[in-house]
């Protein structure tokens, strides 16, 4: 989810917890920081937050199932962190030097950094960097908490010792097609 799939929303909860969340494009950098790009509406906390000043935020990412007839939330990720908007030469340097933790989104196959670049370059677009320590994940396997270092170290011995119960995107699509082929019950 952090790599760029799903729908992400950022809330500046300390500035105005009642303000609506801003939807953002996101990508996980190889160094564990999360790049976000948004076009926050004028007057909202994220629009008025100054550049180069860390703002406490909540990032919520929701992944819906690939069933067009029913809205089913397949997984969500939540984190509290600090968002710093980047402008000028720093912005260009950050985009040029960024490498995602995965070259393409495992769900849709897109390069998440490309979407971040497009939105940041648009009218009213802002580019930000989120730093955090922990991520909460809600999925079919239950609720779990992960350090960002743990997420980045997917090739560690611990990761190999405890295989994930998650399905690959291809396995999910195969299962969806098999269920759809059965037709409606009843």
Model-predicted regions and their roles:
Residues 1-48:
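An N-terminal domain-cap segment
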Residues 1-2, 26, 49-51, 69-70, ...:
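A general structural signal for short secondary-structure junctions and capping/turn motifs
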Residues 1-5, 45-48, 74, 125, ...:
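Anion-coordinating catalytic cores for phosphoryl-, nucleotidyl-, and glycosidic chemistry
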Residues 6, 32, 53-57, 77, ...:
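Residues at beta-strand starts and edge strands
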Residues 29, 60, 131:
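Short beta-strand segments
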Residues 33-38, 79, 84, 128-130, ...:
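Short hydrophobic-aromatic micro-motifs
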Residues 40-110:
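Short, structured beta-strand-loop surface elements
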Residues 95-186:
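C-terminal edge-of-domain segments
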């Amino acid at each position: 989810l952090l790599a760029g799939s799903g729908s992400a929303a950022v809330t500046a909860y300390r500035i105005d917890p009642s303000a609506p969340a801003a939807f953002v494009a996101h990508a996980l950098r190889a160094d564990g920081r999360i790049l976000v790009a948004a076009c926050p509406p004028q007057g909202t906390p994220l629009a008025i937050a100054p550049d180069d000043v860390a703002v406490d935020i909540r990032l919520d990412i929701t992944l819906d199932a690939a069933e067009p007839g029913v809205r089913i939330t397949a997984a969500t990720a939540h984190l509290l962190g600090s968002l710093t908007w980047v402008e000028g030469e720093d912005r260009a340097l950050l985009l040029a030097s960024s490498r995602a933790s995965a070259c393409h989104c495992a769900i849709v196959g897109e390069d998440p950094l490309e979407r971040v670049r497009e939105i940041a370059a648009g009218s009213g677009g802002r580019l930000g960097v989120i730093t955090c320590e922990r991520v909460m994940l809600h999925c079919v396997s239950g609720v779990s908490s992960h350090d960002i270092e743990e997420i980045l170290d997917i090739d560690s011995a611990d990761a190999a010792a405890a295989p994930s119960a998650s399905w690959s995107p291809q396995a999910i699509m195969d299962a969806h097609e098999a269920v759809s082929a059965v037709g409606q019950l009843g």
